C-alpha cells in the first residue's frame, strides 16, 4: 500500500489530537506544533508549512511514525498480518477477495480517520511471485512455501 506524498500531507490537527491522548503537557504540544509550522526554504525565502512534517527535520520521522501507529493498531485489531517501515506497508491476506476487501476498508480508514491519501495507482493487489520491499526482493519458492531474499541492484 502506497501513501501519496505522505510526509508532505500529514494533517497537523490530526497529529496533535493523537499526541494529545498521551502528552498532557500543553507546552510540549505547543512546541511540536511550532516545529510543524516552522516552514521550509524555497529558493531564498521561507514558506510556512500548513500541512506535512518538515522534510529533513529531526522529529519528522518520529511524528510520521506516531500517526501511522494508528494504522498499525487498526491492522492488529483486525488480526491482519503486515509489515510496515515508515510509510511503506505490505498487508498479507489469503485470497484475492480478502485482499480487495482489506484494500477497500483500509483505504477508507486511512483517508477518513488519518486524513491521508492512498495512491491507488501504486497500491497493488495480487498473488506475488516476488515482492520488492525496502531494497530487497523476496522470491516465493512454491514447493517449500518459503521466501528467499535478494538485495536490489541500483
Task: Map each language-model feature to its residues.
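Active-site and adjacent loop segments of nucleotide-processing enzymes
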Residues: 136-154
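Conserved polymerase palm-domain catalytic core
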Residues: 1-130, 136
